[in-house]
């Protein structure tokens, strides 16, 4: 594992603040939004569709504390862009929005460095000016959007069905306590991680924050490489993974195959009380990965000589299958859902940080084994050729 202290030159102007929202393109926005509300603890926030004058696209916006997800679907059969996207990639992330200061300057510098500006929009809603500028990621499935003081230009009045959903169901379910987006992870095909990281460095003036390679993260069968990109203030972190050659197809390669290329693998949602959050999510029916049963026995032995003390009960963490990673300064707790749709692509992470800014590298091997068990169930833990290239089914 490598940590980087060099942030590069501080940008003259413009500042990335935090994740603003994540937009998914899905086959049925109403059903997807309802699923994330009933399962993950979101609540309806805004809507646009035929009733609000939107004739081409319907969007349902849901919110939990400072986390905002937008689910969008085509309304008409001739929407080729959204239709082709769904056929190739399935339901998944189309856009990641960052809230920024001085959007005009950031866009100007990105354009000078070669970024493709998809479109520029100025939105006025509730007397707040919003500047919405999507950036095209070369050869990527998803776009990045810069948002300055943005409020959604959607009908903020909940639809009758949304009000009914909250009154009859959501208000009776346990609260999950998920607060903010901690980080968002992208997967790339082999040998494309470096070009993706260079895009962030060149166009957005991000820097390398942390990295691991396949000599550090591997099992008997598969491996990965990963680099984390961050803005100057390090309030936004974007890990980028790529598969490394192994005896069998890695879970990163499985993702790339089913997603039809690069894309967002998972979204990490931060909480201050992961035990309550996971109890609530399990009560709501969310399924999580389970690491090998030996994990917690080994963890207890390691913690005996550790410089830090985990405040939470290890027995409770084992009961809920929550993982622990630590260093001499602090620790984090994390757990991963199974895929949120039928394709084994996008999933969620729930994370609690206690003076620890890592990404669970100490858990990667155990997680890889858990992923491999799921791959085996799907029939996707398949052999590779002598060069580590997966055989196609």
From Swiss-Prot:
EC number(s) from the headed UniProt entry: 1.13.11.27
GO biological process: L-phenylalanine catabolic process; tyrosine catabolic process
Gene Ontology terms, MF aspect: 4-hydroxyphenylpyruvate dioxygenase activity; metal ion binding; protein homodimerization activity
Annotated positions binding Fe cation: 183, 266, 349
Membrane-topology annotation of the record: Peripheral membrane protein
Domain VOC: 18-152, 180-338
Tissue expression remark: Liver.
Cofactor note: Binds 1 Fe cation per subunit.
PROSITE patterns referenced in this protein's UniProt entry, alphabetically: VOC
Positions of modified residues (N-acetylthreonine): 2
A matching Pfam family: Glyoxalase
Coiled coil stretches, renumbered: none
Entry function: Catalyzes the conversion of 4-hydroxyphenylpyruvic acid to homogentisic acid, one of the steps in tyrosine catabolism.
Protein name: 4-hydroxyphenylpyruvate dioxygenase
Protein species of origin: Sus scrofa
Gene of this entry: HPD
């Amino acid at each position: 594992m490598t940590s980087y202290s060099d942030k590069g030159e501080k940008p003259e102007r413009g500042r990335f603040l935090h994740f603003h929202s994540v937009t998914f393109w899905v086959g049925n926005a109403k059903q997807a939004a309802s699923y994330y509300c009933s399962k993950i603890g979101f609540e309806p926030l805004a809507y646009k569709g035929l009733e609000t004058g939107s004739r081409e696209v319907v969007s349902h916006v849901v919110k939990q504390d400072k986390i905002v997800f937008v689910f969008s679907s085509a309304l008409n059969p001739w929407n080729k862009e959204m239709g082709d996207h769904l056929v190739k990639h399935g339901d998944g992330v189309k856009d990641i929005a960052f809230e920024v200061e001085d959007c005009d300057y950031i866009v100007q510098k990105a354009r000078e460095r070669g970024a493709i500006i998809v479109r520029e929009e100025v939105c006025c809603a509730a007397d707040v000016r919003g500047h919405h500028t999507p950036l095209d990621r070369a050869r990527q499935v998803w776009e990045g959007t810069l948002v300055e003081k943005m409020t959604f230009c959607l009908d903020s009045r909940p639809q009758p069905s949304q009000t009914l959903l909250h009154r009859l169901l959501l208000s009776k379910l346990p609260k999950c306590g998920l607060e903010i987006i901690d980080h968002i992870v992208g997967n790339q095909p082999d040998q494309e991680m470096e070009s993706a990281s260079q895009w962030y460095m060149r166009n957005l003036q991000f820097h390398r924050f942390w990295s691991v390679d396949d000599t550090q993260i591997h099992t008997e069968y598969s491996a990965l490489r990963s680099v984390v990109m961050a803005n100057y203030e390090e309030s936004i972190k974007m890990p980028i993974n790529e598969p490394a050659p192994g005896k069998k197809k890695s879970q990163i390669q499985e993702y790339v195959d089913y997603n039809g290329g690069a894309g967002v693998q998972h979204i990490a949602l931060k909480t201050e009380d992961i035990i309550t959050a996971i109890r609530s999510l399990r009560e709501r029916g969310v399924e999580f990965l389970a690491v090998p049963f030996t994990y917690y026995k080994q963890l207890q032995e390691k913690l005996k000589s550790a410089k830090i003390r985990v405040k939470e009960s290890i027995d409770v963490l084992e009961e809920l299958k929550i993982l622990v990673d630590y260093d001499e300064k602090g620790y984090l707790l994390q757990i991963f859902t199974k895929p949120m749709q039928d394709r084994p692509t996008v999933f969620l992470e729930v994370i609690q940080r206690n003076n620890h800014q890592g990404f669970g590298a100490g858990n990667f091997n155990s997680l890889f084994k858990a992923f491999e068990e799921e791959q085996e169930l799907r029939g996707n833990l398949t052999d590779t050729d002598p060069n580590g290239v997966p055989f196609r089914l």
